[in-house]
Amino acid sequence: MVLAAVAGVGLTLAGSPGASARVATRTATVTKPCGGEALAPKPGGGAWACTFDDEFSGTTLNRSWWVPQVTATSAFTTGPIGSEACYVDSPSNISVSGGALHLTARKEASPFTCSWFTTQYTAGMVSTYTGFNQTYGRFEVRALLPQTTVAGLQETLWLWPVNDTLYGPWPGSGEVDFSEFYSLYSYLDIPYIHYNYSSTTVNAATHTNTVTAYNCQIALSQYSAYAVVWTPGSFTITINGKTCLIDNYVPNGGLTSPAPFNQPFFIALTQALGIGANAFNPATTPLPATTSVDYVRVWK
């Protein structure tokens, strides 16, 4: 989850879900095709099979699949020092209604102590840390982003490795931010794929180690479908079916593709407060701010 797009500063998950996590492979019980969505054949041929599908059609979070992120037990936070977001398991921050999951950042009535810091801000995040993970496949999330063009808000739809120290400290084991929104650049989605590589190997013509893109335009007022197709050695990210980024990854540090992306990853959905050029400003950034998720679908 990149919190400063220009600087490329990354933030890892800590605790549960988080650093040095060890989770057995989890599969979801899917009783219908993924939303009835028809897909083109898989790269290399064959048909996609639905492995996970949450349409958020009820009124409560399916906790057999999703676990809320809680700062008190994980130390995970976003936002600038002095205005950090405390992630809490509260219906004010995480709710399901109207056919969507809603993740909200908000200002509380008064300051409170959250883990090691004092803040007045809370936010919502969920992941399939204990409910579902998969190696390779197609992951798609349809989401509506916060409706603001003022700096300070961030949304991330991402994949995180089950064993996040398998290939050393972050970003050695990889991270896939297949959708990343900064409200300062409200017309763009800026995906980012994290791993160790040599900058001398980047080749736009062959899509070698092209880890990010700055030309993926979005319509802020509409739901968009953000998808990533992950195969051994490559990622293809699309927005509403239009290709946004292709990365044929070639890691360094003694690794050979498909490492480090050759283990299960789980899904994380985050409403965040920004830092850096997109820093949250209590005086100007509008709150509450919500990312609404229409569905999460996965195929293999």
Q: Whereabouts are the PLM-identified features?
A:
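Secretory targeting and sorting signals
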Residues: 1-22
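Proteolytic processing junctions in secreted/extracellular precursors
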Residues: 22, 26-28
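GH16 jelly-roll
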Residues: 28-300
